[in-house]
Amino acid sequence: HAWSCSYTAKTAGGKEERITIRFKTEDGLLVKNEAYGAAFNVDRLMLADLIQLKSKMNGVGEGQVLQTREAEVKLPTSWAPGQTLSAHLKMANVPVKPTDKPLETTLTCKVGERFPARQVFASLTGDAIRLACEQDGYASSRAFIEDLGVALTLESTSSQTHYVNEIQTLDVVR
């Protein structure tokens, strides 16, 4: 199925950025497009919107594709509070340029409580599972929406920024 979501990312300083995300499921993977206004968008191939397999920036950069070459993923034995999900990824740009360095990243998410998905957005059904994640100096609070198979980011914090994401629209096409 396919679905789209638009939200406003708000900073503590009152700055707002409207972001529109479109997802479709293909062969168990999420094909995702994030549009940051009219000029810039990112195409991604993801697992559950947690683990990135491929990304391409459109409207900025040289059109390279960042591909995940190796992924070491540790899934929790159950989705019980306190369990941990982690992924260590090794990525490379294609086509490669002489100045490119290989990239590595580690995502760690601690499983929190289960709660009704409608608390994230009124039209959602079923349950959501709270995830507290860290990756490359960013901490994020996410909700894994079981019916959609996707982890929506509700809040993200780094040493420089703090964003709270307010979902405006969420349309699911089944």
Predicted regions and their residues:
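Acidic, serine/threonine-rich low-complexity disordered tracts
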Residues: 1-59, 65, 91-174
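Surface-exposed beta-loop interaction hotspot
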Residues: 59-81
